[in-house]
């Protein structure tokens, strides 16, 4: 069924939604116009860019200082590359962001995962001299209200003369198995623990910075919509962004479950990050596509006209173009046809 043949109540519903969205966008614009016309938005965006890059870079530096080896160098290079991609995404304009959006989705998913980890766990590489890494569960607290330690990675001490993993019976209900570790594995855990600890430290600030930047992005789309007399850019951005963070959170949960089954503790932490990035990437992409298709289906801010010169129909995407365009030599599928151009000249169409 075409949009023209839809039932009156369906059309009425979409009209109501569109009117409400237009009103909301107008209200937002009235509240933010003075900000966008000043240097505040630009300075805020620049601050968020610098902070986010700095925060990601500091995670890499934690790995470098923890273990100056080939393994750590490889990990740090990957983190530095991620920071570089994040900076490119932040620095790009709205048009360039369309091309960089896949990496932006993954970055958002990663932030959702880091935020989840920080809200669930305390990660510490300090404590007793025998401790390599301590992971505390914030959801399981002692009678004093403090998070209980969940998993601890230790060096040889007391009656246990080998590197090992301790598991808290008060949290898991299982007897501490003192799982043996090789010295090399213990060293690797120390490095990854430093990285996880630093990531946990910056997660709340990185999340706040991301929220500020997302508000800035939405403000840009509101400003664009007001210039075009539309609401579509704002709606699409809000829907796609919400879908990305939701998918990132779901992916982080799934990743933490899988990671825990493979290697409890660090597997939980890094599994959540991987799951968040993957979930954010695919969830963001499909949210964007689904929103675009839904808005196209109801012809939201899209108008079809008939060209006065060639009598052909063309679509005016009000949310993208200041004026609708007909069949230009650059976007008509029949541009290579000699007969087509002859007919254009014959109708004296101005192209």
From Swiss-Prot:
PANTHER family: CHANNEL_COLICIN DOMAIN-CONTAINING PROTEIN (PTHR21525:SF9), MOTILE SPERM PROTEIN (PTHR21525). This is Uncharacterized protein C13G5.2. It comes from Caenorhabditis elegans.
């Amino acid at each position: 069924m075409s949009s023209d043949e839809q039932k009156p109540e369906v059309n009425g519903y979409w009209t109501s939604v569109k009117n409400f969205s237009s009103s909301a966008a107008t209200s937002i614009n009235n509240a933010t116009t003075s900000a966008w016309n000043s240097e505040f938005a630009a300075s805020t965006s620049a601050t968020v860019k610098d902070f986010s890059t700095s925060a990601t870079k500091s995670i890499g530096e934690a790995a470098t200082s923890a273990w100056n080896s080939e393994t750590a160098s490889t990990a740090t290079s990957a983190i530095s590359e991620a920071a570089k991609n994040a900076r490119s995404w932040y620095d790009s304009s709205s048009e360039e962001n369309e091309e960089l959006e896949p990496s932006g989705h993954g970055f958002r998913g990663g932030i959702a995962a880091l935020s989840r980890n920080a809200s669930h766990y305390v990660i510490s590489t300090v404590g007793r001299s025998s401790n390599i890494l301590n992971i505390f569960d914030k959801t399981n607290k002692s009678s004093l209200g403090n998070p209980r330690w969940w998993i601890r990675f230790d060096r040889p001490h007391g009656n246990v003369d080998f590197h090992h993993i301790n598991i808290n019976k008060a949290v898991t209900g299982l007897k501490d198995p003192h799982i043996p570790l090789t010295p090399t594995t213990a060293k690797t855990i120390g490095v990854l623990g430093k990285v996880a600890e630093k990531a946990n430290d910056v997660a709340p600030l990185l999340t706040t910075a991301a929220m500020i930047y997302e508000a800035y992005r939405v403000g840009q789309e509101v400003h664009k919509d007001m210039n075009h007399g539309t609401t579509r850019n704002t709606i699409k951005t809000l829907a796609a962004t919400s879908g990305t963070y939701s998918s990132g959170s779901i992916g982080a949960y799934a990743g933490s479950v899988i990671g825990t089954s493979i290697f409890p503790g660090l597997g939980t932490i890094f599994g959540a990050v991987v799951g968040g990035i993957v979930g954010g990437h695919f969830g963001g992409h499909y949210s964007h596509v689904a929103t675009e298709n839904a808005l196209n289906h109801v012809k939201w801010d899209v108008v079809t006209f008939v060209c006065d010169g060639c009598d052909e129909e063309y679509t005016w995407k009000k949310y993208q173009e200041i004026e609708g365009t007909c069949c230009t030599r650059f976007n008509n599928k029949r541009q290579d046809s000699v007969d087509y151009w002859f007919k254009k000249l014959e109708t004296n169409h101005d192209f």
